[in-house]
């Protein structure tokens, strides 16, 4: 009839974005620079905001990115015993317009979610995985806020 397995058997399954812990640690190192670049970009975007309400939203996102940077640095140090060298002092690329900046920020947040999901699958169970889950939900919240700002500004 049907091929069946005892209730305790589970066929092996690996998500396509699963990576090793070593790969996750390398991506954490990259994430530090990514969060720093986002922070610099958002500083430029804040200056272009048409009003203080929108500037405050972006400032809140920027401040979250600073916190993410610190958490990623701590995770990297905890896993490797080494500190990540200071992020480069490069300047943020110029923002051509407020709307284009919002679009770029929105896409950047979505890309971060994809990268961080891979890191999440490479981390062991526990506080680091839980912390990264918080960062992922922050990035989703940021994407939602940028989407809201885009809709608001494009409908005017």
Question: Language-model segments: which ranges?
Answer:
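Non-heme di-metal
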Residues: 1-156
């Amino acid at each position: 009839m049907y091929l069946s397995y005892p209730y305790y058997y589970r066929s092996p399954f690996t998500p396509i974005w699963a990576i090793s812990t070593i790969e996750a640690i390398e991506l954490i190192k990259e994430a530090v620079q990514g969060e720093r670049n986002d922070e610099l970009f958002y500083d430029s975007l804040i200056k272009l905001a048409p009003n203080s309400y929108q500037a405050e939203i972006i400032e809140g996102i920027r401040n979250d990115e600073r916190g993410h940077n610190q958490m990623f640095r701590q995770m990297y140090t905890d896993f490797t015993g080494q500190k990540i060298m200071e992020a480069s002092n490069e300047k943020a690329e110029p923002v051509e317009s407020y709307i284009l900046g919002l679009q770029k920020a929105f896409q950047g947040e979505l890309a971060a979610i994809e990268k961080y999901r891979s890191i999440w699958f490479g981390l062991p169970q526990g506080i680091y995985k839980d912390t990264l889950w918080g960062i992922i939900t922050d990035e989703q919240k940021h994407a939602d806020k940028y989407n809201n700002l885009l809709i608001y500004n494009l409908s005017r």
